[in-house]
Amino acid sequence: MDYLGVDISKRSSVVAHYKNGKFQKEFFIQNNKNGYNYLLKYLNDLDHPQLIFESTGIYSRGMERFCCVNQINYIQMNPLEAKFKTSALRS
């Protein structure tokens, strides 16, 4: 399975791609039409991709809409939940 973790900020996002638990690639996209088109082309080459990103309020809404419009599976995590999961991994 292909999992893509997305760190969303105001103008851009960092995407980290893992396949079967192994790191594949990291890349940046702009949070605009061109960036989302690039991401869509990348995702179209994968089998059953799953996007995972933290709910960052207004910044994550664009990614959520992108996923819904393009019927891409995604998990939107609560920021507090993401922090606890990250802390648990580090200990």
Located regions from the model:
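Phosphate- and other anionic-substrate recognition elements at nucleic-acid/protein interfaces
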Residues: 1-91
